[in-house]
């Protein structure tokens, strides 16, 4: 399979806009938006694979992710979003099976990770931006289609005697629902364990009345009354949204990165690639100026550093995942005016909706970094400005290498006190100092007092290695070469285990348990071997299993 989305450059395109959507229609009327899924069968990543029955591939989910983010920035006045299908009697059949069967293992993993991040963004929009989601399941709702519904606040299934909700992956394909389905059924909807077990082994799914009794949906409505019921529930959902600062919105323009075999360049972010060494330098530049107030922030719109730099970093991370699989180590660097980077972070704590959404955007991007399967080393030297939101890059890194010379300093701000939580619900500093939470508070207090120099960084526990000018480059070189020699599989598992110490949440269970099992199952012969269920799906052959339990 060609794992790259169609584009003039041959590179993947993670940006889009409503006028370019091929699979979704976004409309807004006052406080209520409608997202209608009507997948164009031969307009996916691979035009040889037909996306039947409103099934999706990455191109479909890229549009969904764009719509979710665009609603928050361009239409903050929206309080309820109705997600439904433009097809009669089919809501969504989930991820396209033939796409998955023909995709490489790394692509499968990154595809599922991306779809999980999009569903979590929907839930965050509900919890933090006051935009509630209603799944209007007007037909069969299976696999990833039901997982999309599970991310919504309210699920309504049409009661027509045939429409079902289903998670058929285990009985049909010998894999797991890859977008959080199992976790949300029991953790979010709190379906009884035995019923959840039965549900997830019923390939045909569960119809209306039973789906309601089991807690799989919130309402079932006859087809003749469905449209009116959805409209009424959407109005009630909008009325239940919290009172908060909203609008007017801003437009999200294109990023237009410059792409080559050795670099990915944006206005504030640059990735220098060294394919031979399997390393990359990811540098984020501090702002040249920051808005003094909300009016200036609105005037700058999506071109403001806080929004644009975060979007650029997000796009860069996705390109590293999908286009540069063999880059295993990323050196995180920053450059520019440290004071302005710090001030930009403090401005994000403002009350206006645009500051709130900028702050939440940085949170999503940093969490995408947290679950990106790369080794991240922060490099703190004379050019660095790890301050404000950029300090979180250091806090997110697996290690930090600090040059011990005068002038080298970092400066965490208010954001690092909990405004940008990881998936475990804690700040990165709280996760770092799990044994003594007061140390996290001490770091934030120190940053508010002024820059923290290299020696003080070591005292506060912010430096993995502190080295002088003579040893610094050699220490870093040896560490990178050593890391590059280790198994990427083992490193991914080790890093994921260490990055989320502390409490478990829905998200950590999805990424740390469900996704980990799914990634293992994806390479097992029972799923993807020559006679595995995913391989022979749609063929006359029956799957042949290795019956040993492991």
Predicted regions and their residues:
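C-terminal alpha-helix plus adjacent terminal tail
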Residues: 1-80, 85-93, 99, 107-109, ...
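Hydrophobic, secondary-structure "cap" segments at the distal end of domains
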Residues: 180-195, 425-442, 451
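Catalytic binding pocket for nucleotide-activated donors in carbohydrate/polymer assembly enzymes
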Residues: 403-419, 424-431, 450-471
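Conserved phosphoryl-transfer motifs of two-component systems
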Residues: 156, 218-219, 464-465
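Hydrophobic/aromatic ligand-binding patch that stacks against planar heteroaromatic rings
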Residues: 147-148, 184-185, 198, 393, ...
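Glycine-rich beta-to-alpha active-site loop
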Residues: 86-87, 91, 122-173, 199, ...
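Well-ordered mid-protein domain cores that form the structural environment of catalytic cofactors
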Residues: 97, 101, 106-122
